[in-house]
Amino acid sequence: MHPRGKNVRIIDQKYNQGTAAARNVMVANATGEYLFIMDSDDVISPDCIDILYQKMKQYSVDFIAGSFQRQTWDGDIYPGGYRYKDTLIKDGDYAVAEYRYGQGHEIFVATWNKLYKVQFLRNNNIRCIDGYMIDDVWFTYQVIMCARSCCLVSDCTLFYTYNPNSVTSVRYSQKLSEQYVGTLSLKSEWIHGLRNKSFYNGLMYDILKMSVYHSYCIGNSEFVSPVDKQKLLSNLLSRKFPYPSHWYFNKFLFKALPFLLFYSFPMSIKIWVIRFIVSINLKDKVKRWFHF
């Protein structure tokens, strides 16, 4: 029992089922109007919840996202983090998806440091994938695609503790590689019904870019066997979504075109290209091009 039992409820899952299962339990069992997610090793500012809550009361959007700063275990500021410009997005269906994939503005991928309307998450059946260690990517993708409104806040409301041994900091294992592949497959399935949208080019570009990035990282991993690398690369380098029903000439089309051309090659050539890039150690250049 927590000392503040009337205000704090502890849900015991009996054994460690991972962060994805824990977050799904939170969504299912939340009794309030809003849900805030944070990791146990991070620190929120003293006014974090008040800032996000006041914005929610002012604008009544599907979610509020605060800015954050990275720090070390000792509390020293570490390079990175993200600071939004104060922005209100409130234009109806796919408003947030248009902002992210049509206009190309960033909405940070982490589930944490966001205040969600619980009913929004439940109405759209937004959940993490049980068993996945990289649960943020799919959860936030659903949020962006389903949200009709959101507010981005310039105030720094969370300090993210950089952990060199965290899931996102270590090299690609077999399990992590399979989860990245699975997440991209889910994204490809999701966008099938959006072929006529003007932001579809951005959706294609996002999937293609990240597929090539993960192909490189898997190809460069010493923890994935050659046989499994072949299977994973074949999956990642197969286009699983349709072409748009209308080709909108915008910046994302021109960004996607080199990837679409690459994906038109025979699989053996695509895999050879990835292996060649790995062999000449272009890791630093790839990391400079692609951020996630």
How should each PLM-predicted stretch be described?
Residues 1-12:
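Acidic donor-binding segment of Leloir-type glycosyltransferases
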Residues 9-11, 151-153, 244:
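General small-molecule cofactor/ligand-binding pocket signal
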Residues 10-30, 40:
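Glycine-rich, basic loop-to-helix element that forms the pyrophosphate-binding segment
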Residues 35:
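Short aromatic/hydrophobic "clamp" motif used to bind/position activated sugar donors
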Residues 156-164, 170-197, 210-242:
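Catalytic core of nucleotide-sugar-dependent glycosyltransferases
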